[in-house]
Amino acid sequence: MRPSTSRASAIALTALLVSFGSVAAQDTTERPWSHLGPVRIRDLTPFGILRMDFLPAHAVTATPGTWALELTVSYQNTYVMSDNVADYLRAKGGGHRVRYDESDVAAILALPGEAYIVDGEIAVVDLTAHYRFTRHWGAYLTVPALFYDGGFLDSTIEGFHNLVGVGQENRELAERNQFFVVNKTKSGTLVFDGPPDGGLADPVFGARYSVVAEPKRWNLILEAAVKPAFRDAKPFVSSGRTDYGVQVSGQWFFRRQALYLSGSAVEYGGVDIEGVDHQTQLVPSVTFAWEFGLGRTVNGIIQLYSSPSVIKDTDLDELKATKYLTSLGIQGLVKTWVWRLALTENLLTFENTADIAATLSVAKVFPPKSR
């Protein structure tokens, strides 16, 4: 656990909460309120990004024949490494930042025991088409794309750490804005000394059943989905295996607030890539969210997410640790447009998750034509 990072996260989240409260205080006039549901974020961690992970169920009510197109863009920065890699970089740099090269790959692979480093930024783009067949049944198709780069956020993150007076958690050991991955565990070896080619990832087909067609106080939503492997395995793009699973979501609505709880179970087919765990496993996940009105058309959202690591074949406890993420955001409904903006931070466990992620989502609803 990295207590200084936890402190930085707490400061950032507290600042956002204060901002939300200030906005809410400016608009106390009673008016109709629209509940939208949780932020549509899936697992963004570099060690689980290829598996199918359910997006938490939205709470937008639609009539039969309604279409919707939803574009979600998430961008995350990851900088994690094992203790022996940190010791190596510290010794090599001698107080200066290291520019990764092939000699570092060889040196890390030669370290005794298991070792890993993941330094880079990942963009996840999800395009989802929704359709409502009946008052209760709907379906969706999500087509994701993944992109990798050395990025641009390292300086911003380090500056924020300095601003709030916390440590850099080994960020001072390497030059900024590089992409570098070396993973040496019992599963094998995976090496990238530059950003890999991104591209279209495996699509997800899902069906959704809403128990209450037009919910006023509560709703229960059941979903089933499959992620077929439509291509051969490709590192950081496709697992080459098929995943499938189910999700159950409870939704409770109040005057200007709503609570959401989603639980899912996914049969993860593993990854057909050398250096990554191959084993099939059942991966549960839980999302809890609180939505509250802030203004005329804007809501705030606080969201918590947890799921176990898919990495099992290692002696490094930090890679096997359960992941905990928190998201804070704002979202709104403007005519037939739904927009969401959120920041996601890691909690409790830090060595197998992204340091920070930002998500922007825009959806356009196409109601059925009146006859």
Give the ranges of each region predicted by the language model.
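Outer-membrane beta-barrel pore domains and translocons
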Residues: 72-76, 144-146, 210, 225-229, ...
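Detector for outer-membrane/organellar transmembrane beta-barrel domains
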Residues: 65-67, 72, 77-80, 237-312
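Residue-level signature of outer-membrane beta-barrel architecture
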Residues: 73, 131, 143, 209-211, ...
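Outer-membrane pore/translocation modules
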Residues: 144-281, 317, 333
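Outer-membrane beta-barrel biogenesis signature
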Residues: 23-104, 368-371
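Outer membrane beta-barrel transmembrane domains
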Residues: 89-92, 162-189, 276-371
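Transmembrane beta-strands of outer-membrane beta-barrel proteins
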Residues: 67-71, 139-141, 205, 218-224, ...
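Outer-membrane beta-barrel channels and translocator barrels
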Residues: 64, 134-136, 146, 212-215, ...
